Design a protein with these regions (language model features):
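Regulatory nucleotide-sensing modules
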Residues: 1-39
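Cyclic-nucleotide recognition modules
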Residues: 49-107
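Short histidine-centered beta-strand/loop micro-motifs
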Residues: 23-29, 47, 67-69, 109-112
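Short beta-strand segments in beta-sandwich/barrel cores
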Residues: 40-46, 64
């Protein structure tokens, strides 16, 4: 994984290729500004060692990441597809919608469903409805999700093959 640190004191467009991550340091950013996704899909996650890269949100074109509300260690933004975002955009005060908070609440709700099958169905439902598309009896997401990431998102381990028996 390519990883860059980004404080970003000047307003500019930042471009990341699929798989790159950037650490957003809130202490080096002007107050009252945010990042705004121009194109692509990003995963926002916590860089703290204790939370092991916990996913907070997925962002797409037009979504804003308020950097003044982040924890002191900041957050990481990972490009799930080729990504570009504007730095130091003024926060849309009257929008009434915070994409990161909305995603975090939905992911928390999914993790509290009764069993792994329910959590998996709920996860794919929200991902397809917001970021993907249905294609008959299957669905398509514009990025790859590993078994490890799916397990992290639904709060359980996923096994792709049965364990050997003696």
């Amino acid at each position: 994984m390519n990883f860059h640190s980004y404080g970003g004191s000047s307003s500019k467009t930042v471009r990341l290729v699929t798989g790159q991550s950037v650490l957003i340091d809130p202490s080096s950013r002007p107050r009252g500004t945010c990042l705004e996704v121009e194109s692509g899909i990003a995963r926002v996650y916590c860089p703290c060692e204790e939370t092991e890269g916990m996913t907070l949100a997925f962002l797409q074109s037009g979504d804003q990441l308020r950097t003044d509300l982040l924890c002191s260690e900041g957050v990481c933004v990972e490009a799930l597809t080729d990504l570009s975002f504007h730095s130091n955009v003024n926060i849309a005060e009257n929008s009434g919608f915070d994409a990161v908070n909305e995603w975090t609440l939905q992911l928390l709700r999914i993790r509290h469903l009764g069993n792994a099958e329910q959590r998996l169905q709920a996860l794919f439902s929200i991902l397809v409805n917001r970021l993907g598309r249905r294609c008959g009896q299957w669905c398509e997401l514009p990025f790859r999700l590993t078994h490890e990431r799916i397990g992290e998102l639904i709060g359980c381990l996923l096994y792709t093959s049965p364990s050997p028996r003696d």
